Each structure stands twice: as C-alpha cells, then as structure tokens.
C-alpha cells in the first residue's frame, strides 16, 4: 500500500501545532532537570518528550479544550503513543531500515516549504518555542522510520485480489455508504471476569454520560475511547456494507443518522457505534470523466555496467544519436544497438504509456518533444537514452482510477486491522516500566489510563 496518511502532511501537522499560540513550549526550558517517564526495552521516554507531545495535541484543540480528557488521562494516552513509536523504531532498526540524511533533509525542506518558510526560518521558529533543531530532526527521522516499517509491513502481508475489487466496485455502484464513529473500551486477550466487568461498567458509564447530554459522542470518544483514533473523535470515515464487519452490517442498515447503538461486544472489547450520515454510493462515485494523456514512443538504451563505464556508455549513445541525425532509421538502430532486451527486437517500441510510467524524468523528456522528433541523449537510473515520440492520445481512465481507489481502500482497511494486531503483539512482548502516577477515574467511569494498541472491530480508515 503506497498510499497512507502522507508522511509530509503528518509531519507538517505536528510542526504547525507547535507554532500555535497556546501555552508556550519554551516554558519547558525553565523546568527542572529532565527525568525518565517510561523505560521501553533498552530505550527511554523523557519528560520533555512527553510534554512536547502533549503540547502538540492540545494545540489541535484550541477553543475546544473541553473535548480533551483530564490532563492526567491525556498524559497516559500520549505516553502510550510515544511508547509505540519507540517500539516501532526499534523494530525497524532491527529489520535494517535506515533513513538517510538526504531523505531526512528532503522531508524537513518539504515541511519548511509547506509552512511558507525556509529551513533556517523553521529552525528559528523551533528554537523560539524551546525545541532544539537536533531534537526536531530526530523526531522527523523517527516518523519516517515508522512509515517505512508500516510500508514494508503492507507490501509483505497485504494482498487485495481482483475479485475483492470487483465485489467492492459492484457494491459502490449500488447501495449506500455510511459515515460512522465509534468508542472502544478495550478488553485484553485472555481477560479475567473482573477485567470484563470493569470494561462493561466503563462502557455503560460512557453511554450514560452521552444519553444524559453531558458529553457529545465526539467528545466522549476523545475522552474515553481506547481506540487508536480516539483523538480523531473515533471517526471511521465512509464505509460501504462490504467494509463493515458482518456482525454490524445488518444493524447499521436499520440505523438512522444520529443514532447510537451499543454497548456491542466484539473481539477487541466493548463498543458504541454512531451513524453520522448516509449517502448514495452511486452519487458519491459519480463525477466527470477522468481523462489522461498517453504517449507512444520508441527508445534506445545504453546501460552503464562494470564492463561499460559511464564515459564509454555516453560515447556510444552520442554515436547512435549522430547516426540518427545523419538519416539512419531509428527502429533499425534500436534493433541493432539498444540494450533494452524488453523491446529492442520491436525497434525500441514502448507502446502507449502515461507520462510517469518510466519515471518523471523520462516522461518529461517525452512530453517536451513534438511528434516525430528525437531527443538528445539523457541519463536515467537505467543508463543513457534516446527517445522518439510517435504520438499522443487522450484516454478515459475513470474506471481504472475507480478500481485503483477501491483497491487502495480495501488495502488500507486490511493494513489497519493487521498492523494494529502487530502493534498489540509488539507492545505485549516489550518490557515497559511506567514511572508516572495512575490517573484517577473521571465522570465515574473507569479511566482510559493506558491506551493500548488494540485493534478495534471497526478500524479507522482513510476517508473518501
């Protein structure tokens, strides 16, 4: 799954929160000596890290502070997220995942650009808020590392069949889609009867608070839910029936917008489910036709190898280009001299392709040509090329894009479910020693002292 919550966007959100005018993070400079708040295997979480992360969360709720849980509960929720980041970074490093300085610098440049400033300007803003630039770089490196771990997990374990896409496409063209929210009170694997009873009491208390109008569903989700998307108000996005577990699908069809059902017992614990709104799938999918430009071209490739060094390859491609300029037939030269075994026998014919099919640089050279013209030699990762553009056409890619979007949605749902199980296992296997006080109960419900990486029965998904 290459599409995931965009790494640059997620980092940008984290950074932009730092700049909001709430209780200043620079106050941290005047705090006593830093201390450890959690030991995570061979790593630690420092109080300063926790304070910065809490500051970022609170920045997102300026003007809506009442939706946040009490400070001591929020502290434990955020600490658990930091613990999971430490565990994921450690696992990524064990798996050989490394973030190069070039990749890190590019990500930071993108963050600065999206904040309409330079890297130096970003550095100055961070320092003004009491955050050192090396600490910021490390946090960005960790975010990218976790992204690569998740990406590798998806590529190795997540498969979406064409049959699944066909079924979902048929469902999307008829029927309804449902916008859902949920609240989860987690029950650990192998829970005792006492743990189950405590969870039942907590979910009943949450339902009572909502029914009495003391808290809106969204606020209750932020305050009490054990789901990883609690701080997003438990929003599950839009779901078609095939994306809703069978145990809930029939129930959802009978619900009215605004209705709340539960508590419901699932594999991860007790849930409350709210139907926010319903929309027609066909209307949601409808839209203008999506057209794309495709190009027809031939090319000649001279590879760079241990035996054929850069200078030798460049001299060879220059000679071939001179032959074509002197009147030699492009197809004949390609058959005789191109080192692309996939198409040299066809005179270098690449067929019809979108501009990004062979990389952005290759596509840009093709787009810059007029039909019939031949490019000057240019370099790519594969070697040295000459390209002749033969034609262009407009192709309707609406259906293809719909299938790609549905495939991505299914893959994202599978990834959420599978990765949350992976995080739960990672957390249970780790040595974690918390060195902060347990929060007191709030609203007479068992507090969400720790937000485990529990897989909700309805995992959060990318919204359409």
From Swiss-Prot:
Instruction: Report if keyword Transcription regulation is assigned.
Output: no
Where does the secretion signal sit in this chain? 1-25
Identify the residues that the record assigns to the PpiC domain, covering every copy: 175-277, 292-391
Q: What GO MF terms are annotated?
A: peptide binding; peptidyl-prolyl cis-trans isomerase activity; unfolded protein binding
Q: Name one GO cellular component term.
A: outer membrane-bounded periplasmic space
Start and end residues of each stretch annotated as Disordered? 439-464
One GO term under biological process is:
protein stabilization
Q: Which HAMAP family match?
A: Chaperone_SurA (MF_01183)
Report what the protein is called: Chaperone SurA
Organism (species): Xylella fastidiosa (strain 9a5c)
């Amino acid at each position: 799954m290459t599409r995931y919550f965009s790494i640059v966007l997620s980092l940008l959100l984290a950074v932009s929160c730092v700049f909001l005018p709430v209780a200043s993070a620079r106050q941290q400079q005047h705090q006593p000596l830093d201390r450890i708040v959690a030991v995570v295997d061979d790593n630690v979480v420092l109080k300063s890290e926790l304070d910065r992360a809490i500051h970022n969360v609170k920045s997102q709720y300026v003007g809506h502070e009442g939706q946040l849980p009490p400070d001591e509960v929020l502290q434990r929720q955020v600490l658990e997220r930091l613990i999971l980041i430490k565990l994921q970074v450690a696992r990524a490093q064990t798996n050989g995942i490394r973030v190069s300085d070039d990749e890190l610098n590019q990500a930071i440049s993108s963050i600065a650009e999206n904040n309409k400033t330079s890297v130096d300007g970003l550095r100055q803003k961070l320092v003004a808020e009491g955050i050192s630039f090396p600490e910021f770089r490390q946090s960005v490196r960790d975010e990218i590392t976790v992204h690569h771990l998740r990406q590798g997990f998806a590529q190795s374990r997540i498969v979406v069949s064409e049959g699944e896409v066909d079924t979902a496409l048929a469902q999307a063209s008829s029927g309804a889609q449902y916008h859902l929210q949920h609240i989860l009170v987690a029950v650990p694997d192998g829970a005792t009867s006492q743990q189950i009873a405590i969870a039942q009491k907590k979910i009943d208390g949450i339902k009572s608070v909502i029914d009495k109008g003391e808290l809106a569903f969204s606020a209750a989700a932020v305050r009490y839910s054990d789901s990883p998307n609690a701080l997003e108000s438990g929003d599950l996005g839009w779901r078609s029936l095939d994306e809703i577990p069978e145990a809930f699908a029939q129930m959802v069809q009978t619900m009215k917008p605004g209705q709340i059902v539960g508590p419901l017992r699932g594999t991860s614990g007790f849930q409350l489910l709210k139907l926010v709104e319903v929309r027609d799938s066909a209307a949601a999918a409808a839209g203008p036709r999506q057209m794309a430009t495709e190009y027809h071209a031939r090319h000649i490739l001279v590879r760079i190898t241990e035996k054929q060094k850069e200078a030798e390859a460049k001299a060879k491609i220059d000679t071939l280009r001179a032959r074509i300029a002197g009147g030699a037939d492009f197809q004949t030269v390609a058959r005789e001299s191109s080192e692309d075994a996939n198409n040299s026998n066809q005179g270098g014919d690449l067929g019809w392709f979108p501009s990004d099919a062979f990389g952005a640089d290759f596509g840009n050279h093709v787009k810059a040509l007029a039909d019939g013209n031949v490019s000057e030699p240019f370099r790519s990762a594969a070697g040295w090329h000459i390209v002749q553009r033969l034609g262009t056409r407009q192709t309707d890619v609406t259906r293809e894009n719909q299938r790609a979007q549905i495939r991505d949605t299914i893959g994202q749902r599978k990834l959420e479910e599978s990765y949350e199980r992976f995080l739960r296992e990672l957390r249970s296997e780790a040595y974690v020693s918390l060195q902060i006080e347990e929060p007191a109960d709030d609203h007479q419900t068992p507090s969400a002292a720790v937000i485990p990486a529990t897989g909700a029965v309805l995992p959060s998904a990318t919204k359409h």
